[in-house]
Every structure is written in C-alpha cells, then in structure tokens.
C-alpha cells in the first residue's frame, strides 16, 4: 500500500500513458460502435435476422451503461490501472468472438457474447481512465488530457460509421474487430509501468447486489419496451407488463440506494449542482445521437441512397468534432464551462434543424445535411471538454471513479435510449399509410409523393431531438455557474 501510494504521488501523467488510455477508449467508441452502420452486412454474412442484429447492436451500450458505475466504484478500491487492463482483456476477447463468429447455429452465441463483453470492456475503461486523468494530470495539462480523451470518445463515435463502411467494403467487416484486438494490445503495452491509483479512503467494500440487480432489470425492461413497443403493440400485455416491471424495479432501486451505505449510485454526488448539470446535459446531448439514425434512414428509405452514400454525408461531422474539440478546451480556459456548453448545445440544435426539412428535394436536402452534420460535430466539440472538466473538477477525490462512472453512464444510456426512442418514433409514424395526411396543407412536400410517411416521420423524430437539446440548455443555465472556477 505504501509503495503504491508513494509511486502514485510522484508520478505525473505523460503522453505515452495518455495515448494508451485513448486507444482503450476508441476500442469502444470507434470499433465497437461500427455495428450501427455494418449490422446489415454482418447479419447477411452470418445468416442472422434483423431482430438478432438489433439486439447485437444494442447490447453493447446497454451492458456498458448498466455496469459502468459499479465498475467505476470498484476501480476506486481495487485499482484504476488494474480495471483499465481488465477492460483491455475483455475488449480483446469480445472482439475475437465477434471477428471469428461462425455461420450457422453458433453465430448468435458468438456474436451476442462478444458484443456483451465489448460493453463490459467500455464499462471498465471509461470510468477508470477518467479517474486516472483526474489523478495524474492537473490544471491546463488535465484540460489537454481531457480534450484528447474526448477526441477518442466523441471523435471515435463520429468516425465510426464512415470507418466501418470503408473497412467493410475494402476488407470485410471481420477485419474491424481484428484491428480492434491489435489496438487493444498496443494500448496495454503503452500503459505498462503506470503506477496503481486507488481512492485514499480504503474502507471495506460491499457489493451492492440488490441495487445492481434492480437497476439492470429496470433498464433492460425499459429498453425492450422502447425498442419493441411498436412491433408488439403499445397496449399489448407484454409491453404493459414490462412497463410495470420497469416502474416497480426502478422504484425499488431508488429506495434501496437511499437506504444503503454501499450504494453503487451515490446520489449525494448530485448535491453539487455543477456536477448534476454536466451529467444531465451529457445524457441529453448523447441522446440526440438519435438524429443520426433518423436522418440516415431518411435518405436511404426515402431518397434511395446507399449506405455508403448516406455515410459520406457524415464526413463533416467527423472532421469537425476532431478539429474543434481543442477549441472547446480553449473556450473553457477563457470563459469557464457554462458558456461553451450552452454554445455547443445551440450549435447542435441548429444542426438538427438543418437536418429536419425532409419536405425538400433530395439534392437540396443533401446540401443542408452536409452543413448540418458539420455543425453537429462542431457543437459537440464545443460542449465535450467543458462538460467533462466541469464534472471531474467537482468530484471528491475518493469518489473519482464512481462519479466519472455516473457521468459516462449518462453517455451510454443517453445514446442507447435516445437512439431507441427516435427510432421508435420514426418507425411508428413511417409504417402508417395515413400518417402523413394530417400535414397536408401545413407543409408542402416537393418531389416524390410516395414517401411522405417516411419524410413526415423523420421531421417529427428530429423535432424530438431538438426538444432534448432545449432541455439540455435549460439544465445548464439552471445549474452551471457563470464564469471561471476560482483556482
């Protein structure tokens, strides 16, 4: 204990360790997230149906979101470097299972197990690596480290659709996951020699089994309701039963966490308004990831574009978020977190509005989409570092892992439920033959008239995302203080 503590006190974070951490982050946000774009190719090659592939896509974010706080708290006690390494090992095994998934009856077992392990990998790497950034970097160096860490997460997510499509077309989708193994091994090598870091208060650790189980059941039930409600029927017995399960177990979860001293979600962290605002707005800004699935489905189903052509529209998003994420850091240093977070949300909202006019001709819409996706990346870049720094800098030292775990849980669950809800709205409206009639005389639709249901569905689903941006702005203005934090 003493040797570990003295080594950690003397150690200063360097670029070798930081690059190793970033490689771990992109194994989840870049490589694992490519399934959002390549799922049809994977399903076709493996002989799996759409429902199985939808589960395979969703299970990674779901497992990450469910376990990220538990593992973040565990990292504070057993060692953050150790948990990051475990995350690398899980990523390697998970990617290997997906990459070698056989055709036939074992395909779904290999695929779903591998995707679940990738989610657990993200749950290990994200909170523990953020806690290491908080521990081994300070001041401006920490803000730079957070910016580069954010490039791995936000930037990796932005590039994933384009990257997945290009690799699948050139080499085949399996090579995405083989490459992920190589990246994970390199990350492990770069982090060799990093001293262990633990919370200073080494109290006896008690696993919050009841809290974890009730939270997991509530989240899984809610996810099934959102994703399958339209197919099963919103008033069907299974959907109503699952809704009841989600409500009951959710209430039990809050009751258990409020009464136990070993709660895996420490609600006392939310007594700090800055941390609360950063986490809530982070959930909402990740939830507008639903914008991408709706707008890309719109141009493919309504405009008959190919997946590759649709993916190329997002190129500006990837370039902007990587190019401007350091700008968010500079804005943070000059103005504090509040202004750049609000500016980022406003730009993101404008981007979604530009993606919304599905009544235009496809040639006109493509121009707006290119501009919109570029602004989308710019807005998220402005927001990312100020929000992450606001959350990290307001965490007590002994709760760095658990607190950063809650913050990143907001990312995973926000994206999971944002995509699910947006897709559910889009699917429900676009599948109805008479769904567009109520807009006749209100909005003029140019060009083809056989796709009005799809175009109407996209406009309504995208307006839902604009609403979430508005709520994010409100939460920031109510919770994040003006100006820079005093040093």
Question: Which residues make up each language-model segment?
Answer:
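Membrane-interface helix termini in secondary transporters
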Residues: 41, 72-73, 77, 166, ...
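Central cavity-lining transmembrane alpha-helices of secondary-active solute carriers
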Residues: 58-73, 126-130, 315-328
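Hydrophobic transmembrane-helix bundles of small-molecule transporters
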Residues: 169-282, 288, 313, 466
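12-transmembrane solute porter fold
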Residues: 18-28, 35-37, 237-242, 249, ...
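Small-residue (Gly/Pro/Ala) motifs that create kinks and tight helix-helix packing interfaces
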Residues: 39, 156-168, 222, 226, ...
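Extracellular/periplasmic helix-loop-helix junction of adjacent transmembrane segments
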Residues: 38-67, 106-112, 308-312
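Cytosolic juxtamembrane N-terminal segment immediately preceding the first transmembrane helix
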Residues: 1-30, 44
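Helix-loop-helix hairpins in multi-pass membrane proteins, especially solute transporters
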Residues: 76-210
């Amino acid at each position: 204990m003493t040797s570990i503590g003295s080594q950690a006190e003397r150690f200063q974070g360097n670029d070798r360790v930081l690059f190793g951490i970033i490689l771990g982050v992109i194994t989840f946000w870049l490589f694992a997230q490519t399934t959002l774009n390549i799922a049809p190719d994977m399903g076709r090659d493996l002989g799996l149906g759409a429902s199985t592939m939808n589960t395979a896509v969703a299970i990674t974010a779901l497992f990450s979101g469910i376990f990220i706080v538990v593992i973040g708290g565990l990292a504070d006690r057993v060692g953050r470097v150790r948990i990051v390494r475990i995350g690398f090992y899980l990523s390697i095994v998970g990617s290997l299972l997906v990459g070698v998934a056989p055709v036939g009856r074992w395909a779904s077992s290999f695929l779903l197990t591998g995707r679940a392990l990738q989610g657990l990998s993200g749950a290990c790497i994200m909170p523990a690596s953020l806690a290491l950034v908080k521990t081994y970097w300070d001041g401006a160096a920490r803000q730079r480290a957070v910016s580069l860490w954010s490039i791995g997460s936000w930037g990796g997510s932005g590039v994933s659709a384009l990257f997945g499509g290009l690799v699948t077309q050139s080499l085949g989708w399996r090579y995405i996951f083989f490459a992920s193994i190589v990246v994970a091994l390199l990350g492990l090598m770069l982090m060799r020699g990093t001293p262990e870091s633990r919370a200073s208060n080494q109290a006896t650790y008690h696993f919050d089994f009841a809290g974890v189980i009730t939270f997991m059941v509530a989240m899984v039930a809610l996810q099934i309701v959102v994703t399958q409600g339209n197919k099963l029927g919103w008033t069907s017995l299974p959907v109503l039963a699952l809704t009841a399960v989600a409500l009951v177990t959710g209430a039990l979860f809050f009751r258990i966490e409020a009464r136990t001293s070993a709660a895996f979600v420490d609600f006392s962290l939310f007594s700090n308004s800055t941390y609360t605002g950063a986490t809530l707005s982070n959930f909402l800004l990740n939830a507008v990831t639903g914008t991408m699935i709706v707008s890309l489905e719109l141009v493919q189903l309504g405009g008959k574009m190919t997946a590759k052509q649709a993916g190329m529209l997002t190129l500006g998003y990837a370039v902007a978020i990587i190019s401007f994420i350091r700008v968010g850091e500079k804005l943070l240093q000059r103005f504090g977190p509040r202004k750049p977070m609000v500016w980022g949300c406003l730009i993101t909202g404008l981007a979604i509005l530009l993606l919304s006019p599905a009544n235009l001709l496809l040639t006109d819409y493509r121009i707006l989409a290119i501009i919109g996706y570029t602004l989308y990346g710019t807005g998220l870049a402005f927001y990312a570092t100020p929000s992450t720094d606001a959350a990290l800098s307001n965490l007590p030292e002994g709760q760095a892992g658990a607190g950063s775990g809650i913050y990143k849980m907001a990312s995973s669950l926000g994206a999971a439920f944002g995509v699910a809800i947006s897709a559910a709205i889009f699917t429900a409206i676009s599948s109805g033959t008479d769904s567009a009639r109520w807009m006749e005389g209100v909005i003029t639709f140019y060009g083809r008239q056989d796709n009005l249901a799809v175009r109407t569905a996209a406009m309504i689903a995208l307006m839902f995302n604009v609403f979430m941006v508005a709520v994010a702005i409100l939460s920031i203005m109510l919770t994040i203080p003006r100006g820079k934090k005093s040093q």
